[in-house]
């Protein structure tokens, strides 16, 4: 099953009602999103062997919060949604949608916000990005979207992605359409932008007990039923792994049919759990899954594969 975004004026009244039963999509709620992520990263940094890197990621997340409100995006996506709906494509498809210069404006604003907080190699990286040409930055963005990680150093990628993510999240937040679920292919990718998930979460509140995958780019969440591989949609050979016990708030769901895994975070076990922060802070579980022979089916926006990985 895939999820297609339907323009508002094409939805009948019955579709509007049924769409409210199980929301197939949860568009990004940007208010305090990055501040919450930064706070969670700082909290998880305590007594964590990755503490320094988690605090570094928290600085980027906080900068995203500041830049988000200093540089709002105004854009009418109505025509784009209609066109994408007719083609059966994500409206903000990273492989098709032309990038506006706004994302590079966001990158420069992030660099300006982060410079006073950075030193050593990290400062050298953002100064290098600051001096890069417009075309060089576009080439790096294209390489990341094509999963050509060998073309973008892993120390530059988080900064480039942070700006791209802000831009795509702003656009996703402006989508004036609704979404409905219909059968199709490639449910493992974000139905809004076509990017990969970072993790999945079993939620509380109005979506109690439902699993949503969280996009690592536009921050949209989309519904995928539990006990089904989010990568290949098979259900016969799933296994669940944790470092603590069966009641752990973070587990890895592995699939022997496709040989991949994705983390599942349980809000009922820890209401403060956060899709990006807790995924990054639990890399020990990733190491265990790699030892077991499984490949990760997601990418964390603060941790990209380097050349040869």
From Swiss-Prot:
Gene Ontology biological process terms in this record: protein maturation
Highest rank taxon of the organism: Bacteria
Entry keyword annotation includes Cytoplasm: yes
Record-level GO cellular component terms: cytosol
Segments passing through the bilayer: none
Localization: Cytoplasm
Cited PANTHER family: PROTEIN FDHE
Membership in a protein family: Belongs to the FdhE family.
Name this polypeptide is given: Protein FdhE
Organism lineage: Bacteria, Pseudomonadati, Pseudomonadota, Gammaproteobacteria, Enterobacterales
Gene label: fdhE
């Amino acid at each position: 099953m895939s999820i297609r975004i339907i323009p508002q004026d094409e939805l009948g009244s019955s579709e509007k009602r049924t769409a409210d039963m199980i929301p197939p999509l949860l568009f990004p709620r940007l208010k305090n999103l990055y501040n919450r992520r930064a706070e969670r990263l700082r909290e998880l940094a305590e007594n964590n062997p990755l503490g320094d890197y988690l605090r570094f990621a928290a600085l980027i997340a906080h900068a995203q919060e500041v830049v988000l409100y200093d540089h709002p995006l105004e854009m009418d996506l109505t025509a784009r949604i209609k066109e994408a709906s007719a083609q059966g494509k994500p409206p903000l498809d990273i492989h098709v949608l032309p990038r506006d210069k706004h994302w590079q404006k966001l990158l420069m604003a992030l660099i300006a916000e982060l410079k006073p907080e950075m030193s050593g190699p990290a400062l050298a990286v953002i100064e290098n990005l600051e001096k890069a040409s417009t075309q060089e930055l576009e080439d790096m963005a294209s390489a990341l979207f094509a999963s050509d990680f060998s073309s973008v150093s892993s120390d530059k990628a988080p900064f480039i992605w942070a700006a791209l993510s802000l831009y795509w999240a702003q656009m996703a937040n402006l989508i004036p359409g609704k979404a409905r679920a219909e059968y199709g292919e490639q449910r493992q990718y974000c139905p809004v932008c076509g990017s990969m998930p970072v993790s999945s979460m079993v939620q509380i509140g109005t979506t109690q007990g439902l699993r949503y995958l969280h996009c690592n780019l536009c921050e949209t969440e989309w519904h995928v039923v539990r006990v089904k591989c989010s990568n290949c949609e098979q259900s016969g050979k799933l296994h669940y792994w944790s470092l603590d016990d069966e009641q752990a708030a973070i587990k890895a769901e592995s699939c022997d049919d496709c040989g991949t895994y994705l983390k599942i975070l349980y809000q009922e076990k820890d209401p403060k759990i956060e899709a990006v922060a807790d995924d990054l802070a639990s890399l020990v579980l990733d190491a265990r899954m790699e030892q077991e022979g499984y490949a990760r089916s997601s990418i964390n926006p603060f941790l990209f594969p380097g050349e040869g990985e």
